[in-house]
Swiss-Prot record:
Catalytic activity: Endonucleolytic cleavage of DNA to give specific double-stranded fragments with terminal 5'-phosphates
Protein name per UniProt: Type II restriction enzyme CviJI
Species annotation: Paramecium bursaria Chlorella virus IL3A (PBCV-IL3A)
Superkingdom field: Viruses
EC number: 3.1.21.4
Amino acid sequence: MDIRRKRFTIEGAKRIILEKKRLEEKKRIAEEKKRIALIEKQRIAEEKKRIAEEKKRFALEEKKRIAEEKKRIAEEKKRIVEEKKRLALIEKQRIAEEKIASGRKIRKRISTNATKHEREFVKVINSMFVGPATFVFVDIKGNKSREIHNVVRFRQLQGSKAKSPTAYVDREYNKPKADIAAVDITGKDVAWISHKASEGYQQYLKISGKNLKFTGKELEEVLSFKRKVVSMAPVSKIWPANKTVWSPIKSNLIKNQAIFGFDYGKKPGRDNVDIIGQGRPIITKRGSILYLTFTGFSALNGHLENFTGKHEPVFYVRTERSSSGRSITTVVNGVTYKNLRFFIHPYNFVSSKTQRIM
């Protein structure tokens, strides 16, 4: 009896232990399910958050894209309006120039010298604004000048009646590199323009004279070119008819001085112009500033990068006689040569028949 009771007691204890283990396993499984459910809940929450942030990002990007597109359309509309204004202004200038031309009392053949174009340029530009005004000059590449304040008018400099004097003659006879000056309310010249006619290409500088203002290695480069040229002249010291030669210019200083004046590198002035411009004036108003551009080629002071291709300055020599048919003489190294003229010209003057030297 005692043995049976003892066996039942042991089996009961085993059953209790097994039941306890079963309950513990059940509890563990429940906790595992709870943990997995929590992880899934967190994953779903994070996914929802990610989707919401993605939607927000897409919405912001779309909003930005729409804003940029609206801005682009507005800028395009503005550009079209400005282009229409520019074309209307050009047409207005053309009509004004025709009126000026038709109002002349003298009906003789129109001269091709630069003075006529400069005179008309001044008349046209002065009819386009009421001063005092602030101007900024803008060249063909979009380079902008300093602000020029209190401009009331533009005037033709009397020295510009000389077509293309050398710098030495400019100084000696008050004939400046500048053709046109901007005048402020005190009557003082405050900005300077070298103007070229719209048609054709004019020389940058005559260098036939013996009193050149170049110095140092620049002077030596000019003289070296001259010596090379005259060595090609016959013994009679008469330059052959219709013979032209040219040579590239190495020195950027020579180019800048030929184009902008011999005071290049100093303050703007009559012999250090702010801008060289070709053709008629165009004025565009933005805010309180008037931006002056040209219908043709233009370059701000020092911007040699504008002078490429047909505008590149080169040494150039040609045959030349006076209007009366008399021989024109040039002195090189104390020797006089007939019908010979030295220039710094745009490369446009060079043809297939022009001989390159040096």
